[in-house]
Amino acid sequence: MRSQVIEYPMSLVRLAHELPIEAPRTAWLDSIIKGDCVSALERLPDHSVDVIFADPPYNLQLGGDLHRPDQSMVSAVDDHWDQFESFQAYDAFTRAWLLACRRVLKPNGTIWVIGSYHNIFRVGTQLQDLGFWLLNDIVWRKTNPMPNFRGRRFQNAHETLIWASREQKGKGYTFNYEAMKAANDDVQMRSDWLFPICTGSERLKDENGDKVHPTQKPEALLARIMMASSKPGDVILDPFFGSGTTGAVAKRLGRHFVGIEREQPYIDAATARINAVEPLGKAELTVMTGKRAEPRVAFTSVMEAGLLRPGTVLCDERRRFAAIVRADGTLTANGEAGSIHRIGARVQGFDACNGWTFWHFEENGVLKPIDALRKIIREQMAAAGA
């Protein structure tokens, strides 16, 4: 897929009640919809987003003020939107927004939900009950977590992310395995991620120097999520948009976004933040892919492109075995005909063989694998947008 330049609207904010039910894409794409998440999600069409990142209320169950040893008060989450009458009320709320998210998620889409020990297990239960299929749980290990000032529990140094596909048979979801492995020094990316909490210049502050949002997530966390599970041009939905981290990272990484938020101060902060983001260029956004993600090329395509002619003699890299290319795209050797893979296996006495890497052609006295010709075909397909 060719990268595209995304044009973002001058005004990001849309009012949920002014959008029609299942509004056209142009009415909500790259926008912040102001309103309750469930009612706002009704404005989006079925199967319209590729990835969802949700940072729902944690239902922290705080039993009073929390103080440091010097008696200064800890800034914790005590906003009205994080307060529920009971676990049953929280479960009903969770089920409602997850159902709404499931409707707008594409069949091959995935959802990420982040939470603490206060809520993530209840969210996980609802995800499974609604038919989502859990792919991974990711542990975000914080390099600079808040201490446990009362000394009555272990220091809470992580949060948990659940990554799930829309349904068990939801094949074709995006996972950029090779890119994640390459970014991790060619070692498989593990499910424990080490990031600092959001501090310093990245932390949004109001005119009084106070935090704009109590649970602002680090951009590095969202960047890894998007680089792992989406492609440039994909639509990322955040139903609890807050200070706009998802939108800012999506814009920088060439993804579309749609955020839902009901609190005007958060909307104002997110709008200013996103408008200040400069998207990366096409070259920087190219995602590394592996063999499985590359388009299939038939050996006959190499011949049809004139890169090999009937009668060409192929051999292995040590010139031990030889085969002749036939006009129908098969090879013949030792009186037997078949595909490049079958004949490669037969001449070696093996059960299987990758003919693309086994067979070589000669060019200017140098042997080259026919896989180099397949690469030329794939480059032509990419240039044509195939």
From Swiss-Prot:
Known catalytic reactions: a 2'-deoxyadenosine in DNA + S-adenosyl-L-methionine = an N(6)-methyl-2'-deoxyadenosine in DNA + S-adenosyl-L-homocysteine + H(+)
GO cellular component terms, A-Z: cytoplasm
An MF annotation (GO) of this entry: site-specific DNA-methyltransferase (adenine-specific) activity
A Pfam family this chain is assigned to: N6_N4_Mtase
InterPro entries: DNA_methylase_N4/N6, DNA_methylase_N6_adenine_CS, RAMA, RM_Methyltransferase, SAM-dependent_MTases_sf
Disulfide bridge positions per record: none
Keywords: DNA replication, DNA-binding, Methyltransferase, S-adenosyl-L-methionine, Transferase
Gene3D superfamilies given in the database record: Vaccinia Virus protein VP39
Top enzyme class: transferase
Residues in RAMA domain copies: 280-382
One GO BP annotation of this record: DNA replication
EC number assigned by the record: 2.1.1.72
Keyword S-adenosyl-L-methionine in record: yes
Family statement: Belongs to the N(4)/N(6)-methyltransferase family.
Role summary: CcrM-mediated methylation has important cellular functions. Contributes to the accurate cell-cycle control of DNA replication and cellular morphology.
Protein name: DNA methyltransferase CcrM
Classification of source organism: Bacteria, Pseudomonadati, Pseudomonadota, Alphaproteobacteria, Hyphomicrobiales
Gene name of this polypeptide: ccrM
